[in-house]
């Protein structure tokens, strides 16, 4: 197999993010995709490595390494990237004085057993805590005291001092890493501002927050007048296609009984909207009826007055005729 060239040319410039080692090929596929995918993958990988070797290089223990630049794509992740730790008090002092850390051997020769043993840890070499005899120094203030107990106490003091220094370093780092005030981090993911969300978007967000509990919202208490969850995540359960006739008949009877027992629901807004013009029409009819009633009453009184007038005239003419007749006789 002939060696292939390391020089790669692209008709359309790809998107390269060296911080994430990301390469996006924007050229469209032509022809059979399966045949060209392998060659395209090789060229894209070669072009990515060509860009990597253009960065600043340095040699560390017979290996060449490069420092990747900052990533341009912000990928979502569970936890944020670890920040550079604040140097401890000793590290600052060593840097100022030029003290370099020496690499110690992992094994040490034990003079007592004439063997190579670990420098630190279990069964380490030259372990003075295993001595059965301690030589009393010449300048000892009290030669009769317990030197074994004194050694144990000094070790406890050293451990406590190291722990105190470790806690101080952590507190010093916390002061520099803890941010105060509003967050200045960029939002991860594509979305809209909370103020621009619709009522339905807010509702979905509330439902998702309710389910984000250890029991998946099963024991979450609801507020008074709160609506039920829109998406419960439960699958619909359908009845069997083959069911006995008695069960279907009983279900139909239950529906009829429920329809009979329920009262008609009246929507106040619709009822007031419909009843408004009807009420006005009824009031107009009542006013008109009252006027007609008074008019009819006056007509009746007028008819009665005329009737009484006619009757009185008839009575008067009849009495005069009778008197004249009597005179003639």
Swiss-Prot record:
Belongs to the RRS1 family. GO terms for biological process: endonucleolytic cleavage in ITS1 to separate SSU-rRNA from 5.8S rRNA and LSU-rRNA from tricistronic rRNA transcript (SSU-rRNA, 5.8S rRNA, LSU-rRNA); ribosomal large subunit assembly; ribosomal large subunit biogenesis. Involved in ribosomal large subunit assembly. Residues 227-248, 262-329 are annotated as: Disordered. It is found in: Nucleus, Nucleolus. This is Ribosome biogenesis regulatory protein homolog. It comes from Caenorhabditis briggsae. Keywords: Nucleus, Ribosome biogenesis. It holds the Pfam family RRS1. InterPro entries: Ribosom_reg (IPR007023). Residues 278-295 have a biased composition (Basic and acidic residues). The gene is rrbs-1.
């Amino acid at each position: 197999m002939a060696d292939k060239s390391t020089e790669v040319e692209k008709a359309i410039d790809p998107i390269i993010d060296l911080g994430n080692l990301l390469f996006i090929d924007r050229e469209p596929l032509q022809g059979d995709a399966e045949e060209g995918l392998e060659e395209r993958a090789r060229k894209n990988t070669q072009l990515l490595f060509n860009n990597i070797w253009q960065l600043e290089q340095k040699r560390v223990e017979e290996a060449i390494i490069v420092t990747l630049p900052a990533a341009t794509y912000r990928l979502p992740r569970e936890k944020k990237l670890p920040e550079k730790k604040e140097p401890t008090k000793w590290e600052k002092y060593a840097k100022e004085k030029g003290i370099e850390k020496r690499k110690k051997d992992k094994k040490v020769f034990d003079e007592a057993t004439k063997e190579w043993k670990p420098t630190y840890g279990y069964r380490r070499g030259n372990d003075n805590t295993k001595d059965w005899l301690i030589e009393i120094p010449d300048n000892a203030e009290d030669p009769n005291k317990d030197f074994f107990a004194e050694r144990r106490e000094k070790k406890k003091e050293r451990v406590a001092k190291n722990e105190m220094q470790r806690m101080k370093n952590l507190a010093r780092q916390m002061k520099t890493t803890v941010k105060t005030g509003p967050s200045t981090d960029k939002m991860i993911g594509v979305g809209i501002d909370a103020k621009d969300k619709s009522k339905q978007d807010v509702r979905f967000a509330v439902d998702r927050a309710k389910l984000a509990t250890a029991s998946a919202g099963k024991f979450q208490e609801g507020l008074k007048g709160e609506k039920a969850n829109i998406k419960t995540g439960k699958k619909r359960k359908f009845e069997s296609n083959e069911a006995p006739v008695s069960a279907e008949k009983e279900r139909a009877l239950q529906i009829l009984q429920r329809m009979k027992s329920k009262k008609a629901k009246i929507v106040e807004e619709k009822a007031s909207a419909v009843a408004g013009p009807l009420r006005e029409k009824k009031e107009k009819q009542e006013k008109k009826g009252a006027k007609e009633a008074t008019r009819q009453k006056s007509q009746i009184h007028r008819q009665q007055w005329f009737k009484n007038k006619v009757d009185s005239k008839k009575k008067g003419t009849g009495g005069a005729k009778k008197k004249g007749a009597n005179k003639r006789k």
